[in-house]
Amino acid sequence: MATPRRPRVNPIDTTLSESALFAANRAVGEVSFDVQRVDGVTRRNRLHESGSLRVRFPSPEGEGLSAMFVNTAGGIAGGDRFAVDIAAGEGTRLTLTTAAAEKIYRSNGPTSRLDIALKVAAGAALHWLPQETILFDQARVERRFEIDVAEGAALLLAEIVVFGRAAMGERMLSGSFVDRWRLRRGGRLMFAETVRLDGDIGQKLARPAIANGGAAIGTALIVPGDEKLVERLREAAQHFRGEVGISAWNGFAMARFCAQDAVRLRADMMAVLGRTGAALPRLWLN
């Protein structure tokens, strides 16, 4: 008796192109929500989360609301993309922070992208106070802030960027860091700035006009802001451990920081922010 022939099965092609394989391994995350004032208290109204980015809301204290972003990917690698879109409704009080310092890892070529959109309605106050962003050597990242502040609204936005892990004896020698900030008030562009550091970043940071050899920089943007506020912020000068410049123009104030490491820079920033009347997130105090 003849042995029956087995049906021919075509093997499944499981190979992926290099670009498709790379895309399949990239982290993507998005958080979008808005808050409204209800019975004198700020409450979350709408929330969307996707991918590796999540947000948690600690127990509210007083009339304000706090939100904490969590990157479940554990960091940002080359080609990852994250987006945040937050709207604070009229009369609300919202503080935003992160669960930990954000780490931007070494890239083999692709650039990571972070897009942050903030909208602050009349009578509202939004405080953007994440923990520092740490760039590893050969990291590549592009970050964009699009901020719309209504007349009569208040904004405090503070960012710290650290080039390398000083505690591990590491410094960022090369890579790419592009940081774009656009601030509009009442629909009118008030402030536009793009910071671009690429190539031999270590050598550029050594220049006196850039970081004077420091490994950490920071910026605090305050709306509204005037010379009276600047004078009050400058009272913290006796506590500074790095270099700090504070000025005001066009209805807002700005403080720029530079220090040898993140510890000194954070201390300087806390000394300044403490004079704005803002309550710093508890994670900043640990």
Curated annotation (Swiss-Prot):
One Pfam match: UreD
Keyword match Cytoplasm: yes
Coiled-coil intervals: none
InterPro entries: UreD
Compartments it resides in: Cytoplasm
Gene Ontology molecular function: nickel cation binding
One GO cellular component term: cytoplasm
Function: Required for maturation of urease via the functional incorporation of the urease nickel metallocenter.
Family: Belongs to the UreD family.
Subunit structure: UreD, UreF and UreG form a complex that acts as a GTP-hydrolysis-dependent molecular chaperone, activating the urease apoprotein by helping to assemble the nickel containing metallocenter of UreC. The UreE protein probably delivers the nickel.
Protein name as it appears in the record: Urease accessory protein UreD
Upper classification of the organism: Bacteria, Pseudomonadati, Pseudomonadota, Alphaproteobacteria, Hyphomicrobiales
Gene that specifies this protein: ureD
